[in-house]
Each structure stands twice: as structure tokens, then as C-alpha cells.
Design a protein with these regions (language model features):
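N-terminal domain-onset segments
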Residues: 2-84, 88, 95-165, 172-190
Length: 190
């Protein structure tokens, strides 16, 4: 049995475990699903292998599913140099959902060509990091158990109240450890 602890998640922007996911839920005037912290040692396979690492999720999911990963942007907005998007990552061949997530990207940390590609939103950030040879550090801040709500259920094809696993991750510049992205990544039942 996995151990988890409840988090106090009342519409608190920049919550260390749910931001930027909470921003999209707040904008849609929808209550966040039940989200609890879980120790990485208690995450079952294959979720542990997919979440507990310091790599980008795009390449990790591509390797696991033996397919290229595509991006479907559900919502997006920009506030000066901060670009937010709510996304679904899909396998290319079957268009099967392999991740639901929310990301805040600090555009000014990227070269102009990469910035343009990020905002065009035709590829996942992980793919763009590789395409533009951008070095980064990936540092998961915590691991999550999410009780699937109707919204996530529709996206990830799971029943309400199903237990899903995810992580809260931050990407940093390797030289000065300045943040380049904040991410919540939620995996479907595999």
C-alpha cells in the first residue's frame, strides 16, 4: 500500500506542488482534483520509471511507448516573458494520450529561435530542448497521487476517482541554476 499525505490546496497560486496546474483550474473556475504527495519509493512501476528521473518527459515517454510524442495544446496564455500552456502529450502513431500537464516557461531564458518554436506550440518542450541543443537540469520537486476528476478523465480516458501518478518538476539553466520552466506532469493508467 502506498503512503501519501494530504496537501492544503485551496486556490493557492504558485503552490509548490500544483503550480501551474492550479492556474488553469482557477481560470476555468474548476476545483482542483484531490492531489496528495507521495514518496518516490512508494510509486509503483511502471510509473516510478517514468517519473523518478532527472530527464525530460518527452524522450522518456517516447522510449517507453516506442513512438514519437506529439503535442496537443488545450489552453495557453502569455504574461510578458512567461508563457503558460496546458497540454496533452500523445503518441504519434495511435494518438493515444500519454501525459496531461501544465507548464510555465520563462521565454527570456531561451534563444530567439527556440522562443518562437515554443510559442508556435507544435512540439513538446522536451523535444525543443533537444532540437535546439539547450542544456538544462531537471529537478523533480515532488511526486503526486491525483484522484482523476471528470476533466482529466476525459483527456486521459480514465474513470473518475482513479488513482493517477505524476510529478512536479522544475527545469533550470545548468550554469546559474536559474529556472527555465515549472511543470506538473500526470500520467494515465498504463
Amino acid at each position: 500500500m502506498t503512503q501519501s499525505k494530504s496537501l492544503n490546496l485551496t486556490t493557492n497560486f504558485d503552490n509548490e506542488f500544483t503550480f501551474p496546474l492550479d492556474e488553469f483550474y482557477n481560470l476555468s473556475k474548476t476545483k482542483l482534483p484531490v492531489i496528495k504527495a507521495i514518496d518516490k519509493l512508494n510509486i509503483p512501476e511502471p510509473y516510478k520509471s517514468l517519473l523518478v528521473h532527472e530527464r525530460d518527459m518527452t524522450s522518456t515517454l517516447g522510449q517507453f511507448h516506442a513512438d514519437k510524442i506529439q503535442l496537443d495544446v488545450l489552453n495557453q496564455h502569455q504574461q510578458e516573458n512567461e508563457y503558460y500552456r496546458e497540454v496533452l502529450l500523445l503518441t504519434k502513431s495511435e494518438r493515444r494520450p500519454v501525459e496531461y500537464g501544465a507548464i510555465k516557461i520563462f521565454l527570456h531564458k531561451f534563444p530567439e529561435s527556440a522562443r518562437k518554436a515554443i510559442v508556435e506550440a507544435t512540439a513538446p518542450l522536451g523535444q525543443l530542448l533537444h532540437d535546439y541543443n539547450i542544456n538544462y537540469l531537471s529537478k523533480p520537486k515532488g511526486f503526486l497521487v491525483i484522484e482523476c476528476d471528470s476533466y482529466i478523465g476525459d483527456l486521459l480516458e480514465c474513470k473518475e476517482k482513479t488513482r493517477l501518478f505524476g510529478r512536479r518538476n522544475s527545469l533550470y539553466e545548468p550554469n546559474n541554476h536559474s529556472k527555465i520552466a515549472e511543470i506538473v506532469e500526470i500520467l494515465p493508467i498504463t
